[in-house]
Amino acid sequence: MSKEKVILAYSGGLDTSVAITWLKKDYDVIAVCMDVGEGKDLEFIHDKALTVGAVESYVLDVKDEFAEDYVLPALQAHAYYEQKYPLVSALSRPIIAKKLVEIAHKTGATTIAHGCTGKGNDQVRFEVAIAALDPSLKVVAPVREWKWSREEEIEYAKANGVPVPADLDNPYSVDQNLWGRANECGVLENPWNQAPEEAFGITNSPESAPDEAEYVDVTFKEGKPVALNGKEMKLADLIQEMNVIAGKHGVGRIDHVENRLVGIKSREIYECPGAIALLTAHKEIEDLTLVREVSHFKPILENELSNLIYNALWFSPATEAIIAYIKETQKVVNGIAKVKLYKGHAQVVARQSANSLYDENLATYTSADSFDQDAAIGFIKLWGLPTQVNSQVNHPFDK
């Protein structure tokens, strides 16, 4: 009797390698690894999955799709969870879940497995996404079921011939993609401990960053960054290039105690050099091109979208509707932002746009001023009329 097939989200690490051995007793395991911009050795991971016991192994480079369909909407929405975290890991989980479901359909698998623990956000993100895409698929979470200590897991691995990585004594848990790098555990679990330099991987410290500022011109077309210093490139490549440039200058270090979806607080160290530089540049072009009412209303939806994405609801009608609104606002977001990178800071120091609503003749205080100041008298009277009437009725001046 043939076994059911299970699709395993495979990283090549100890947890998911042990999961193959554990799952293959009851399933034919099909391992799937995706590169969302962390620079994995896909060939090595492909072969390792087969060596450990998978019957098939898929490796997928999804950087371009991730950048265009997931990162770009978040960039255009200035998506920060709790006004601080640019949703690094939260953005990659929906595309990973989507690809797992696609391969399940392709191979006839009935079940999807992931390597998340029972106290993190990612278990929720994967399982809610899978249920949204195909509720008939079953989900198993070996690591959550084991509840093993690290020592017990290593003992099981050795007993079953699973290679134990040489860097297993690394105290940190790291997740990385195009949009940044997330780090937790070890000394970071005490929020009073300053994060040591060894906890950072893609940014220089501001103290060791170059003593000379660097300027980067970011070109936007309909809200999408399309060129750095005039050189056009694919979005995924542009983000990676900005990661290198801004990371060199110490941009994008974030130390955050956040409220997890599962109800606990967690101290996280994020490095998002490209994200912070591009988010900063994009906001400045919006400030130049969007009318006041859109500029004031859009942040309300941005905050709601950030919460939806963080809280595992990418495949929600609410998320789809907000992204559609955001996309509509981007038609006029064209131009160039000049970003100054220096000692941990990304600052826009100049900007221009063919869609600019900034009129120098209206704004100037020189003799070139074309603003009709006499019109201000009637405007002020009408603008303040409701407040004036309320005061006269409810708070008459007491002589």
Curated annotation (Swiss-Prot):
Protein name (database record): Argininosuccinate synthase
Keyword list (alphabetical) reads: Amino-acid biosynthesis, Arginine biosynthesis, ATP-binding, Cytoplasm, Ligase, Nucleotide-binding
Organism from which the protein derives? Streptococcus thermophilus (strain ATCC BAA-250 / LMG 18311)
In the record, what terms sit under GO molecular function?
argininosuccinate synthase activity; ATP binding
Specify which residues bind L-aspartate according to the UniProt entry for this protein: 117, 121-122
Please provide the Gene Ontology terms (biological process) for this protein.
argininosuccinate metabolic process; L-arginine biosynthetic process; urea cycle
The EC number on file is 6.3.4.5
Subcellular location, in the record's words? Cytoplasm
What's the subunit arrangement here? Answer: Homotetramer.
Note whether Isomerase occurs among the keywords: no
Q: Where does L-citrulline bind?
A: 85, 121, 125, 173, 258, 270
Catalytic activity line of the entry:
L-citrulline + L-aspartate + ATP = 2-(N(omega)-L-arginino)succinate + AMP + diphosphate + H(+)
Q: What is its main location?
A: cytoplasm
